[in-house]
A protein has these predicted regions:
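A transmembrane-helix-recognition feature enriched in membrane-embedded lipid enzymes
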Residues: 8-67, 395, 399
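Residue-level signal for inorganic ion chemistry
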Residues: 42, 82, 152, 186, ...
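Glycine-rich phosphate-binding P-loop
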Residues: 70-88
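N-terminal phosphate/diphosphate-binding loop that engages ATP/GTP or pyrophosphate donors
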Residues: 87-159
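Phosphate-binding/switch loop-helix module in NTP-utilizing enzymes
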Residues: 151-195
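Redox- and metal-dependent alpha/beta enzyme cores, enriched for Fe-S-associated oxidoreductases
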Residues: 267-271, 275, 288-334, 393, ...
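Generic C-terminus detector
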Residues: 343, 349-351, 357-404
Length: 404
């Protein structure tokens, strides 16, 4: 793909995302939004038909004979799912469960189309799931694993991480080959072929359901009424103040689900260093959060909601001299970094800051004429901590309480 075409495609994709999230203005945005509304109506019909087929048992979900924890959301965009998956998987591991995280590996590098077509024509055996981590070591880089699976594998020793679009196949593989007794489906709320024991639904408190429309006019993957399938609802990105209207809406659709409020808290800064052989950040230096105070910094990110990352930096006292925003899961090029470092040197910043998710997409041997740090986040339960602990106990000791 030529650089010109790639640039035009990225610009168009950015425009579409801005229309969906309500950030784009002008006549072109209004006309395009009308077109997307028609597509949204068609998409809604497909979603409803699919759920009806599973509900009426025309299509069947498949139990795998072990505990299956589903973590997902109703919307696209950054609800902060990965830190919740990490917190839950770590708690399960620490309580003695043999945990496997199953991910589809969004935007990971797959075999070329011709190879997949040839396998289909020749009826070749399906390849096994890609093993990102066997619990002992990380085996794939972020390009082949996907950003989130690579992050989870790096941060969770003792937890198996598998990537495959067929999560039933991946789950069976984890059970048979590794003896796993607990499966965690990352971004699995819409994955109906595998029956979940417990459904954890994440809702971004700062933008719960967008404009209320389904894709592609809005950010909803399925109707709001499907809140009813959740066992627990995690309100992420909370500022600690209760939103009674949102809680009432959730309870109206799902009176049984416990609501747990949580916030993403900065933990520390990690300096990006020389290669570790797999790509991504090598933790050669950590700095406390007050290291940012009154520092002149540049910021770049390729995430769904860059505003939240930039707000963290400002709230911690950083003086942002420039920002670069890329598309979610964007693969940075050497030209991108040449431009970023050039601006950083021109504006005499002390260092550059990015997100942990973006750091895993940087070549490990990239020279850094200006220091580069990533901001490590962790999840903090603000309200409903007892409910979170109860959820873990119900999974670890299912005999103590019936699963919903």
């Amino acid at each position: 793909m030529s650089s010109w075409f790639q640039r035009k495609f990225n610009n168009f994709e950015s425009f579409v995302i801005d229309v969906i999230f309500g950030r784009a203005e002008g006549t072109a945005a209004t006309l395009f939004a009308g077109f997307l509304q028609v597509l949204s109506f068609l998409f809604s019909g497909v979603v409803q038909a699919r759920y009806w087929l599973y509900r009426t048992r025309v299509f069947h979900d498949q139990p795998l004979g072990c505990l299956v924890v589903v973590v997902g959301n109703l919307t696209v965009g950054g609800t902060g799912k990965t830190p919740v998956v990490e917190k839950f998987a770590r708690a399960l591991r620490d309580r003695g469960r043999k945990v496997a995280i199953l991910s589809r590996g969004y935007k990971s590098k797959s075999p070329p189309l011709w190879r997949r077509a040839l396998n289909w024509i020749t009826h070749a055996a399906e390849p096994p799931p890609r093993i990102v981590s066997d619990g002992q070591r990380v085996l794939l880089d972020s390009e082949h694993a996907g950003d989130e699976p690579f992050m989870l594998a790096s941060n969770l020793p003792g937890v198996l991480v598998l990537v495959d679009k067929n999560r039933v196949k991946a789950g069976m593989y984890a059970i048979k080959k590794f003896g796993c007794d607990t499966l965690v489906l990352d971004d699995g709320f819409q994955y109906l072929p595998l029956k979940g024991s417990l459904n954890l639904l994440l809702v971004d408190k700062t933008n719960p359901f967008g404009n209320g429309n389904l894709l592609p006019r809005g950010i909803l993957r399925e109707p709001i009424k499907h809140l009813k399938r959740a066992s627990y609802v995690f309100l992420t990105k909370s500022n600690g103040q209760r939103d009674l209207d949102l809680e009432d809406l959730i309870k109206r659709h799902n009176p049984r689900a416990d609501i747990i409020e949580c916030a993403h808290r900065p933990k520390h800064l990690v300096r990006f260093g020389a290669g570790n052989g797999t790509g991504g950040a090598n933790e050669i230096e950590q700095q406390p959060l007050d290291f940012l105070k009154n520092k002149r910094v540049g910021a770049f990110s390729g995430i769904a909601v860059p505003e939240s990352f930039e707000k963290f930096l400002r709230d911690l006292g950083g003086k942002i001299e420039f920002t670069r925003r890329f598309l979610d899961h964007y693969r940075f090029t050497s030209d991108d970094f040449s431009s970023i470092f050039r601006e950083a040197q021109e504006k005499k910043v002390d260092f550059i800051v990015t997100t942990e998710k973006d750091a895993v997409r940087i070549a490990a041997d990239m020279p850094c004429p200006v220091p580069v740090y990533y901001l490590r986040l962790e999840i903090e339960i603000l309200q409903g901590a007892a409910d979170f602990n109860e959820a873990v106990e119900r999974i670890c000791f299912p005999g103590a309480a019936a699963l919903p």
